[in-house]
Amino acid sequence: MLKPSDTWTWYYDNKAQSLMLDLGMDMVFCVNLPHKVLVEGAFSECKFSVDDASAYQMFVEHISYLPLSEPRKVELALNCVAAKRFHKPMLPKSWFFETQSDAGYAPEEGEVISLKNDLGEGHFIIVENYECASMCMLVDMDAFALNPTKYMAFCEPIKVMHDRMAPMQVVNSSYYAMVG
């Protein structure tokens, strides 16, 4: 698994129209966030901070059991760090999902949760936790249908109210399942 370094640098690539993370040794990671959702600080070069490294490690630990390849786990963890640090505040879009739990459910950052609707069930990681809602990111490789014409892709973020979420429990090292 890729280990964080204090030599890593965030920068915005105008030609690619994307936030990038220079990992050194001619390796560059392209963040999966569109230009329009980035805070102003994303457009200035800055170091991968101690907080970034801590968040990266936390996300890596929480996704270790997911049935993803190591490169996909790194991609997911780095996109989570980028969203946590550089994504503009967003309003919840809970109407896409069914209510699954009482209003008292409060997921933790890094927790993998389940969201359901009439079209299926998706698995998401909590990127940033707020009082009643959280920004989460799709961890499934397959697209998740929000409605018949709108789909989410791997690593795409969305903010959802906590009552739409259900906790996940590891069944074994290769699979995960909903509990509740």
UniProtKB/Swiss-Prot annotation:
Protein name: Cell division protein ZapC
UniProt entry keywords in alphabetical sequence: Cell cycle, Cell division, Cytoplasm, Septation
Domain of life: Bacteria
Gene Ontology annotations for the cellular component aspect, listed alphabetically: cytoplasm
Keyword Cell division: yes
Subunit note: Interacts directly with FtsZ.
Pfam families for this protein: ZapC_C (PF07126), ZapC_N (PF21083)
Function text: Contributes to the efficiency of the cell division process by stabilizing the polymeric form of the cell division protein FtsZ. Acts by promoting interactions between FtsZ protofilaments and suppressing the GTPase activity of FtsZ.
Transmembrane domains' residue ranges: none
Similarity annotation: Belongs to the ZapC family.
A biological-process GO annotation: FtsZ-dependent cytokinesis
The species this protein was found in: Aliivibrio fischeri (strain ATCC 700601 / ES114) (Vibrio fischeri)
Compartments (UniProt record): Cytoplasm
